[in-house]
């Protein structure tokens, strides 16, 4: 099978992502939870593999990400790492595992020992101290602002963020704060295209969009979503890349191409 062929591409590192942003090369990111898919995604040249707390939804059948534990993320991170992908491995810190900088560091150490090369957690200005604490201790950090699914109850549902002038200003403050604290990557979720574009222009680090328009430095989707494996209503920002493709590998290749050439996301996938 094609995806089992050896890849000669160099490993994707944190500095490599920054170089891609500066060169104008889009970053293709997907969630991944096991060794088999890690190998397949790597052969398709996915740049970043995210062990997301979305596993609570797509693997465990949960309605939110809140029940996912640190042990869950560590287990799936180890599964992905065993495939030795050349992609950068990023792992989520689940709800309740980064309430203090010390808690966040202990959680990050566990995930990095499992094979993560960067950790991601949700929040803006209020997490700047935590970001700085981790970065000073050699833990690369990806921040996540906009619609942060762990805050679903505080938001009153899964709603687009930054639609008002005040909301957009706060989102920009959040993004600047985590960058100044040392975050090397930031996810913008469910953010109006114009707001995400402004954030991307204002920051010097790469931005990864999901429902945030095509002006971000890269894109991320949940693997199951982009393969058409989702219950109920499909989110606006999702495209089913399995349509018209002969295999999962071909669908992932199509996703990577679409991100790289800027054809995904289109206006129909944005806010």
Curated annotation (Swiss-Prot):
Enzyme Commission designation? 2.1.2.11
Q: Which Gene3D superfamilies match?
A: Phosphoenolpyruvate-binding domains (3.20.20.60)
Q: Where in the cell is it found?
A: Cytoplasm
Pathway(s) annotated for this protein in UniProt: Cofactor biosynthesis; (R)-pantothenate biosynthesis; (R)-pantoate from 3-methyl-2-oxobutanoate: step 1/2
Identify the main location: cytoplasm
NCBIfam families to which the protein is assigned, alphabetical: panB, PRK00311.1
Q: Keywords assigned by UniProt?
A: Cytoplasm, Magnesium, Metal-binding, Pantothenate biosynthesis, Transferase
Q: What is this protein called?
A: 3-methyl-2-oxobutanoate hydroxymethyltransferase
The UniProt record gives the binding positions of 3-methyl-2-oxobutanoate as 53-54, 92, 120
Q: What is the organism of origin for this protein?
A: Burkholderia thailandensis (strain ATCC 700388 / DSM 13276 / CCUG 48851 / CIP 106301 / E264)
User: Which terms under GO biological process does the entry name?
Assistant: pantothenate biosynthetic process
What class does this enzyme belong to in the EC scheme?
transferase
The record's CDD domains line, in alphabetical order, gives: KPHMT-like (cd06557)
Q: Could you name the Gene Ontology cellular component terms for this entry?
A: cytoplasm
């Amino acid at each position: 099978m094609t995806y089992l062929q050896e890849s000669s591409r160099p490993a994707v590192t944190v500095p490599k992502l920054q170089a891609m942003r500066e060169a104008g090369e889009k970053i293709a990111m997907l969630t991944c939870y096991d060794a088999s898919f890690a190998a397949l995604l790597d052969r398709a040249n996915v740049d970043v593999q995210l062990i997301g707390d979305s596993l609570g939804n797509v693997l465990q059948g949960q309605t939110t990400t809140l029940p996912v534990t640190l042990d869950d993320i560590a287990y799936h991170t180890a599964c992905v790492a065993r495939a030795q992908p050349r992609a950068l491995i990023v792992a989520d810190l689940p709800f309740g595992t980064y309430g203090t900088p010390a808690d966040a560091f202990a959680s990050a150490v566990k995930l990095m020992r499992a094979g993560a090369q960067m950790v991601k957690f949700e929040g803006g200005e209020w997490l700047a101290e935590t970001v700085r604490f981790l970065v000073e201790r050699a833990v690369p950090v990806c921040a996540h602002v906009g619609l942060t699914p762990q805050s679903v109850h505080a938001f009153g549902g899964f709603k687009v963020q930054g639609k008002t002038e005040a909301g957009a200003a706060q989102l920009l403050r959040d993004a600047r704060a985590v960058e100044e604290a040392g975050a090397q990557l930031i996810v913008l979720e469910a953010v109006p295209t114009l707001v995400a574009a402004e954030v991307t222009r204002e920051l010097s680090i790469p931005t990864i969009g999901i429902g945030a328009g095509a002006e971000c430095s890269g894109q991320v989707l949940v693997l199951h979503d982009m393969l058409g494996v989702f219950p109920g209503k499909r989110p606006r920002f999702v495209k089913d890349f399995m349509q018209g493709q002969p295999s999962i590998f071909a669908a992932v290749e199509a996703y990577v191409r679409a991100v790289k050439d800027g054809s995904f996301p289109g206006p129909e996938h944005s806010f």
